[in-house]
Amino acid sequence: MENVPGSFGTSASFALRFGQTIFSAASLIFMCFDYDFYDFTTFCYLATVMAIVTPWSILLALTDTYSVLVKLLPQELRVLSIVFAGDFVLSFLSLGGACAVASATELLASADGKICDGNLCIQYQVSAALAFLCWFLLLASALFNFWSLPSLYY
């Protein structure tokens, strides 16, 4: 297997997974600071996606840690395909959630502050920004794994 930096089982992959875990957990925490986020579907969607991304990233970060410490890269096509598919799907789900929350927050903020007071809108905007950062790292992980996928065929 070709050792692509950032592919599954490397230290660069661990760094990407650690960033995903931090950003997704922080986005979820900022979203859940207010109990009124259940009133809007887009906010619930982002909270659900980040609640899925966080354990996914933690599990793969632990797997990367084990692979780095044992110095054994996972060489099964099926495992790398599942990791690639999960990263790819979750990256676009988090992009959709981040875009939806960013646009809904902008819409609520432009309503003369009647619906979304100052700190509440800032919390939602920070949550959307953290979700965008998580999306970027998820997409990078998916692309690195996609890049190393053909080397398992021969």
From Swiss-Prot:
Keyword Cell wall biogenesis/degradation belongs to the record:
no
Q: What is this protein called?
A: CASP-like protein ARALYDRAFT_485429
Assembly information from the UniProt record:
Homodimer and heterodimers.
* Subcellular location, record wording: Cell membrane
Q: Which GO terms describe its cellular component?
A: plasma membrane
| Database matches in PANTHER family | CASP-LIKE PROTEIN 5B3 (PTHR32021), CASP-LIKE PROTEIN 5C2 (PTHR32021:SF21)
Q: Which residues cross the membrane?
A: 13-33, 42-62, 82-102, 129-149
* Primary location class: membrane
In this entry, the parts of the chain located on the Extracellular side of the membrane are 34-41, 103-128
Instruction: State the membrane topology.
Output: Multi-pass membrane protein
